[in-house]
Design a protein with these regions (language model features):
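DNA-contacting interfaces and partner/effector-binding or oligomerization modules
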Residues: 1-99, 103
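Short helix-coil-helix linker/hinge
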Residues: 137-144
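Short alpha-helical "packing" element that flanks the helix-turn-helix/winged-helix DNA-binding module
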Residues: 144-151
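Regulatory/sensor and coupling segments of signal-transduction and defense proteins
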Residues: 106, 110, 138, 168
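Flexible, glycine/charge-rich interdomain/linker segments that couple
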Residues: 82, 88-93, 108-131
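Short, basic, alpha-helical segments at the C-terminal edge of helix-turn-helix-like DNA-binding modules
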Residues: 187-197
Length: 197
């Protein structure tokens, strides 16, 4: 499961909610028979997500963070995998005890300036890697973020240059400045630690 929440949302401008709706639409587009996703808002603007795939929620968190604009209102992500099957009945009624643990974990990072990811009993190595990922996501410019999004999908710098109407050297500069290569190492490390395919 994954809970996404906007930090300091009571002071956020209305366009923040447009970003959250955009992320929700992008995540919903990943729903399939092989990977079932359920999303609903709980407790205000908290986006609650269930996935039928174990540990998939951390990858969804990375995807959501890559779409979120750097701002004074960071998107906080708390994830956890439970040893339970995906609820085939109405998932809105699914009420597992670990939901509270995920919410409590989210509360520990609500005001954090260095961590936007949490999970109950998260190993120290993953915690440190996600602090670095937080710093990367929080410091990108809009162009760096766009380049990062393309790069993470496997598109070459030459293709990114065409898509963004920029030179290859400009894209190369923004790939370096966005630290997306370091981010891919973090993602690979997390995938390896959680034994994801």
């Amino acid at each position: 499961m994954l809970i996404l929440d906007v930090s300091n949302s009571s002071k956020a401008p209305p366009e923040i909610y447009n970003h959250l709706s955009y992320i929700e639409r992008k995540l919903r587009s990943l729903n399939s028979d092989e990977n079932k996703l359920y999303m609903n808002y709980r407790i205000g603007e908290e986006l609650f997500i269930l996935s039928s795939q174990p540990h998939y929620s951390i990858l969804l968190a990375f995807y959501a963070k890559s779409l979120w604009p750097a701002s004074d209102f960071p998107l906080k992500c708390s994830f956890h995998t439970v040893d339970d099957s995906y609820p085939e009945y109405n998932p809105d009624r699914w009420n597992h005890p670990s939901i509270n643990a995920v919410r409590e974990s989210l509360q520990t990072i609500k005001k954090s300036k260095v961590q936007d990811f949490s999970s109950p009993d998260m190993p120290k190595g993953i915690d440190i890697a996600l602090m670095y990922a937080t710093d990367i996501f929080r410091t990108v410019t809009p162009l760096q973020q766009e380049v990062m999004q393309y790069y993470l999908t496997g598109i070459t710098q030459k293709e990114i240059a065409k898509l963004t109407n920029r030179s290859v050297s400009t894209i190369s500069k923004h790939v370096h400045a966005s630290r997306v290569k370091q981010l891919t190492e973090i993602i690979d490390y997390v995938i390896e630690q959680y034994e994801l395919d």
